[in-house]
Amino acid sequence: MRTIVLFMLALPVAAQAPVDEAKALKEHLLANYTKFEYAIPMRDGVKLFTVVYTPKDTSKTYPFLMTRTPYGVGPYGVDAMPLRQLPSPAFWKAGYIFVHQDVRGRMKSEGQFLHARPHNPSKKAAADIDESSDTFDSLDWLVKHVPGHNGKAGMVGISYPGFYTACGMIDAHPALKAVSPQAPLIDYLDGDDCRHNGAFLLAHNFRFFGMFPKLNPKMYASKDSRDPDYGTPDGYKFFLDLGPLSNADQKYLKKAEPFWQDQMDHGDYDDFCKARDLRPHIKNIQPAVLTVGGWYDAEDLAGTFYCYERVKATSPQCPQNVIVMGPWVHGGWARGDGDALGPVKFNAKTADYYREKVELPFFEHHLKGVATDPLPKAALMFETGTNRWRRFDT
């Protein structure tokens, strides 16, 4: 019998530490960090729920490291410390002021949520907002109200948070000195996630938009499944029996996710789709940029290259623009050691190497002025087959 794994999608990605490592991390955070929760006002009056983890050691100053996400910044409550968070635990030990924010309209943040909110390059009034302005306003508030910082900030995020990171580097706040968009969705409806070269990714879209509206703060304290009972683990049979595509909404999604219908209504690459292409707005980028992706990413491989190529083409003044590609699935560089993909062995702990020798040194250099081994000027690529890292300066 033919069996296919039922669904794959771009989910929030975090380092999946073993139980003992997660326990040690939680103990480290409790001993060394204080958690604060804020409602940060935006220029239009909407308040965004923001969690800030500040080092207890006040003998020195620290940079901000921010992640903006639609998936929630729980566990909620100032006494609840996370067992896993982006980026790697090495950052917590290095010392940063970590900022995790629910984006506009999600979880505990006010306002209206829009998928891949279009960028507004002509803001004239307080009501003219986008993800770039929300990032700017958040950082502006943080540098004015959170003590103990060194005046510099970075951003990092994978997948959807990678999109928000890419938005944040556009018209960036002066404090934002380094960003790392990782597997960022750059053109949501042509290349990333929803459609690949125009083809609708049914399995990915179906489960993602079935799960996404259900996410809420209470789920962090619940073991309830995000998925309905599909009746079978066999994806091929499920979609074969589903019948017309309209049945997906009628039987399962039940109109809980308007963006599903938006995709049905905009099958061509029309103005609705073009407005969600971030590429035309990636220009004059001021922060240093470390774009990261995996060769085996089924969701946002295109966005990784879109991001790097646009910065290269439009921002010669950018202090650093490097792309890193490894033998990883979507977000695979953030979890595990990266020594293998299924039965295929790479004879190298590629993810460990990336986190320890690339990601952390990038932010340490740009946000703290730490002298680190220089990255190549253009690209760091893992070559499968020969199983070695290759450096490119052009």
What is the predicted function of each stretch?
Residues 3-13:
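Sec-dependent N-terminal signal peptides
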Residues 43-56:
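A short loop-to-beta-strand scaffold at the N-terminal edge of the catalytic core in hydrolase folds
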Residues 147-159:
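Alpha/beta-hydrolase fold nucleophile elbow
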